[in-house]
């Protein structure tokens, strides 16, 4: 009773047929998870911020605080 010979032909093809669909599926799941778990909430947060953001009001507050060198506060 001897040991069975190992299959030496087609090893790469057999492993690729098994692992390639798994790799594509996992990469697709990871990409979709990143898109809907990270980028979409980030885009929504930016949109919510800029709905209420007033650039002129912010500029005037920084001008009055004396942050800018080229623009004097309105009191001077």
Curated annotation (Swiss-Prot):
Gene3D superfamilies: Mitochondrial cytochrome c oxidase subunit VIc/VIIs. The keyword Transmembrane helix applies. It is a single-pass membrane protein. Pfam families: COX6C (PF02937). Residues 2-10 are mitochondrial matrix. It is found in: Mitochondrion inner membrane. Pathway: Energy metabolism; oxidative phosphorylation. InterPro entries: Cytochrome_c_oxidase_VIc (IPR051389), Cytochrome_c_oxidase_VIc/VIIs (IPR034884), Cytochrome_c_oxidase_VIc_sf (IPR037169). Keywords: Membrane, Mitochondrion, Mitochondrion inner membrane, Transmembrane, Transmembrane helix. Residues 52-76 are mitochondrial intermembrane. GO terms for biological process: oxidative phosphorylation. One of its GO terms (cellular component) is mitochondrial inner membrane. The chain crosses the membrane at residues 11-51. Component of the cytochrome c oxidase, the last enzyme in the mitochondrial electron transport chain which drives oxidative phosphorylation. The respiratory chain contains 3 multisubunit complexes succinate dehydrogenase (complex II, CII), ubiquinol-cytochrome c oxidoreductase (cytochrome b-c1 complex, complex III, CIII) and cytochrome c oxidase (complex IV, CIV), that cooperate to transfer electrons derived from NADH and succinate to molecular oxygen, creating an electrochemical gradient over the inner membrane that drives transmembrane transport and the ATP synthase. Belongs to the cytochrome c oxidase subunit 6c family. Component of the cytochrome c oxidase (complex IV, CIV), a multisubunit enzyme composed of 14 subunits. The complex is composed of a catalytic core of 3 subunits MT-CO1, MT-CO2 and MT-CO3, encoded in the mitochondrial DNA, and 11 supernumerary subunits COX4I, COX5A, COX5B, COX6A, COX6B, COX6C, COX7A, COX7B, COX7C, COX8 and NDUFA4, which are encoded in the nuclear genome. This is Cytochrome c oxidase subunit 6C-1. It comes from Thunnus obesus (Bigeye tuna).
């Amino acid at each position: 009773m001897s040991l069975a010979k190992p299959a030496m032909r087609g090893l790469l093809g057999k492993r690729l047929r098994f692992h390639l669909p798994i790799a594509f599926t996992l990469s697709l799941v990871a990409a979709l998870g990143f898109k809907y778990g990270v980028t979409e909430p980030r885009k929504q947060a930016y949109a919510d911020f800029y709905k209420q953001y007033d650039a002129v009001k912010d500029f005037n507050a920084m001008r009055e605080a004396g942050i800018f060198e080229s623009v004097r506060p309105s009191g001077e």
